[in-house]
Amino acid sequence: MMIDRCYIEITNTCNLDCHFCPKHHRKRRQLSEEEFDLLTDRVRGKVCFLYFHLMGEPLLHPLLPQFVTMAREKGFKTVLTSNGTLLHRAMALLDTLPHKIQLSLHSHESNARGELSEYMAQVMRFSTQAAGKGTCMVLRLWNQGGMDRENEEVMRLIEKYVPKPWKERPDGFRLCDNLYLEFDRKFEWPGGGGKAASDESDGKQEESDGKLGASPSKSKQEYFCKALIKQIGVLSDGSLVPCCLDHDGDVILGNLFHQSLEEILASPRAQALVEGFRHHAATEPLCQSCESALVNKSFRGKKRK
């Protein structure tokens, strides 16, 4: 069985402090060339898309262009997600031809660093060049219901570089070949992640046996997720987690530095998680707090009411 996506955290450090992004409590770390080579060998032939983050800003890693080239040569389709503030140091990426680059434009309003026009000029120069070389570029405004006052100005600045008409899509617009603008709601992280939640609890989550606590009412909910079937996550210390939302390593199933992927996926805890979702049950407290896993809700698409 081919897993669709693997999120490899090449660094867990970020240069911004966005209000919508949870804060992890792990030691700062980035992958070495040898570690990245080992991890990609472990999932080679078993994963289609390789994402270069789980937490952290991938453009901070000095070996990112080399990593993208290594991954492409091993047969992966490479995907980068960035806040777009460091694109001036990422021009070498244009020659590595990533499959897709996603830029989170909503990070600017959350941090208010520098002029929006300067930020967007950098974003659009890079994006149009990358799209021209064949990389799929996605400009994301995932802030509906949150800090979205700059959205209209962002769209006006985009139009300076890519004039209308734009082709409307269910989630936004196709601006031109290989360049898209995408809208969505403010993301809700599981486990009470995010700045507001961590401020209220001084960075500590309610615990039960070392894991996130869950409300008794959660047991009445129905859950479904394709974690471990369609996606996996790998933290910068090699820990394998079920999905891209386990930002703090609450559900560590094994370590790819020391174990094979098959061994980890065959473990009792991993099997229980997969089997639970087959019966619309969530065995892990983190999953019980995840909006994306609720059967009666859909994260993408319509606005939350």
Task: Pin down the residues of each PLM region.
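Conserved alpha-helical substructure of the radical SAM core
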Residues: 1-100, 110-118, 297-300
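N-terminal pre-core extensions flanking Radical SAM catalytic domains
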Residues: 1-27, 41, 202-203, 209, ...
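Short, functionally important structural connectors and interaction interfaces within domains
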Residues: 6, 23, 47, 51, ...
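Radical SAM enzyme [4Fe-4S]-AdoMet core and its adjacent flexible, acidic
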Residues: 31, 74-77, 93-264, 272, ...
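Alpha-helix N-cap/helix-start and coil->helix boundary motif
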Residues: 65, 87, 258, 270-271
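Short, charged low-complexity intrinsically disordered segments located at boundaries
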Residues: 71, 75, 150-160, 287-304
